[in-house]
Amino acid sequence: MVKPPAGGNDGGRAKPARLKTAFGRTPSQQAWLERQINDPFSAKARALGYRSRAAFKISEIDDKYRFFKKGAKVIDLGCAPGGWLQMATERGVTDIVGVDLLPVDPVAPAHILEMDFTDPACPPKMLELLGGAPDLVMSDMAPNTVGHRETDHLRIVGLIEIGADFAIEVLKPGGAFVAKAFQGGETAAVIAQLKKHFTKVVHFKPKASRSDSSEVFLVATGFKGR
């Protein structure tokens, strides 16, 4: 717990916590840590036992679209650290498979694969574990960044396209695809592709997304088939 500065606070309101700069920590890392400590959704996630604030993003999407329900089959691409898996299973989903390059602690009753989704062996394995075609494919995949904004953005868009292609290939009729994206940039092509196969494609920005972030989610519903 971070203690408030001596002398109390202004008008009874807690001041944002500040961290002493640690050896080897860059200014950007310092800013990220302070933002995490002071972020209400991060604090709420810790208090409720969710592995990340992203759990609240997917919960807001589900509040609107009601994807998570008993009997639904769900695939979670880029599932680490497991917040989306936690929210889905908490809301009644029992048939769910997640995949990530990083290790993910178990989330019962989900199946979790530590694999590269782009490995040709991965999609068949996921479908085998799921026991059939999914009702929902959700993607929070993120690439390794190189620090060059345009290059990093193109890599993100590339992963959205890979996730969308997979969803179009495997979804049940009437199914849905949800993917993290960013406003602007090169997403027009993937949105056009989704509109060919889904009855509705929208941008959705949850309240749990930071207001200063360009993060949005693509939500495609009513899969019409290949």
Swiss-Prot record:
S-adenosyl-L-methionine binds at G82, W84, D100, D116, D140. It comes from the Bacteria. Gene3D superfamilies: Vaccinia Virus protein VP39 (3.40.50.150). It is found in: Cytoplasm. Keywords: Cytoplasm, Methyltransferase, rRNA processing, S-adenosyl-L-methionine, Transferase. InterPro entries: RNA_methyltr_RlmE (IPR050082), RNA_MeTrfase_FtsJ_dom (IPR002877), rRNA-MeTfrase_E (IPR015507), SAM-dependent_MTases_sf (IPR029063). The keyword Transmembrane helix does not apply. GO terms for molecular function: rRNA (uridine-2'-O-)-methyltransferase activity. HAMAP family: RNA_methyltr_E. Belongs to the class I-like SAM-binding methyltransferase superfamily. RNA methyltransferase RlmE family. This is Ribosomal RNA large subunit methyltransferase E. It comes from Caulobacter sp. (strain K31). The lineage of its organism: Bacteria, Pseudomonadati, Pseudomonadota, Alphaproteobacteria, Caulobacterales.
